[in-house]
From Swiss-Prot:
GO molecular function: rRNA binding; structural constituent of ribosome; transferase activity
Keywords for the protein's UniProt record, in alphabetical order: Chloroplast, Plastid, Ribonucleoprotein, Ribosomal protein
Protein name per UniProt: Large ribosomal subunit protein uL2c
Name of the gene this protein is made from: rpl2
HAMAP family: Ribosomal_uL2_B
Family (UniProt): Belongs to the universal ribosomal protein uL2 family.
Gene Ontology BP annotations: mitochondrial translation
Species assigned in the record: Emiliania huxleyi (Coccolithophore)
Subcellular location per the Swiss-Prot or TrEMBL entry: Plastid, Chloroplast
């Protein structure tokens, strides 16, 4: 899919670029698979900000996405490819033979009218969901389970995928989008192929207003805050941070220093750390 460039009719379109929406075949979502939800704007149940820089997004309806793909031995037909305002990937509406309707992440090259299925005996085709043990070496997969039965958690963003590089015992070795090499239990499910809308990462919003439409608020540097709000704050005029190394608002090392706990239980499954 190509990138759409805009002429400089205004300062907001001078650097703007977006993807084409020609792959979308349906404008309105399936009513039985959407629900309304009030935006929390980064607040918890007590109204306290727990995630900064969120709020003010356009009102949107949430689509119920099937990340588990547990309709085994039932074939589904791709009815539509739709836009989802809650993610940068496209979603596909499946019509199963038994009458069920489900949304899934639309893989690259998935077209309306194609058939997909899930289960250990499913064929090796784009969009099918199988256990990692049943997928050949070198295959690209997405929507990968970390815990059996919990649903896909890895490689769900637009254009992402993981690659199966080894199988040994009860585990399969995956190379993740972050270049991390990790062991995953062989019975965990994954979907074949790469997530669609691969050019989403190459787009440019062009103006601050488009960030506000997405719910992204301005980010304030710590050095211009007060000492009570950030460790870098305070001082007279344009002062330095006053520390040997930069830290987060909570005093943890920032900018390149690893903060993952070395004794974390899941650390034994990571063969090589991420580089991105």
């Amino acid at each position: 899919m190509a990138i759409r460039l805009y002429r400089a009719y205004s300062p907001g379109t001078r650097s703007r670029s977006s993807v084409y929406y020609t792959d979308i075949t349906q404008q309105k979502p399936e009513k039985s698979l959407v629900f309304g939800k009030k935006a929390c704007s980064g607040r918890n149940n007590r109204g306290i900000i727990t995630l900064k820089g969120r709020g003010g997004a356009h009102k949107r309806k949430h689509r119920i996405i099937d990340f588990k793909r547990k309709s085994i031995a039932t074939t589904a037909r791709v009815a539509t490819i739709e836009y989802d305002p809650n993610r940068n990937a496209r979603i596909a509406l499946l019509h199963y033979e038994n009458g069920l309707k489900r949304y899934i992440l639309a893989p690259r090259s998935l077209k309306v009218g194609m058939e997909v299925c899930s289960g250990p005996e499913a064929p090796i085709e784009i969009g099918n969901s199988l256990p990692l043990a049943a997928i050949p070496l070198g295959s690209t997969v997405h929507n990968i389970e970390l815990t059996l039965g919990k649903g896909g958690q890895i490689a769900r963003s637009a254009g992402t995928y993981a690659q199966i590089i080894a199988k040994e015992g009860d585990f399969v070795t995956l190379k993740l989008p972050s270049n991390e090499v990790r062991l995953v239990y062989k019975e965990c499910y994954a979907t074949l192929g790469q997530v669609g809308n691969i050019d989403a990462i190459n787009t440019c919003l062009g103006k601050a207003g488009r960030s506000r439409w997405l719910g992204k608020r301005p980010k304030v540097r710590g050095v211009v805050k007060n000492p009570i709000d950030h460790p870098h704050g305070g001082g007279e005029g344009r002062s330095p941070i006053g520390r040997a190394k930069p830290v987060t608002p909570w005093g943890q090392p920032a900018l390149g220093i690893k903060t993952r706990k070395k004794t974390k239980a899941s650390g034994r499954y990571i063969l090589r750390g991420r580089t991105k």
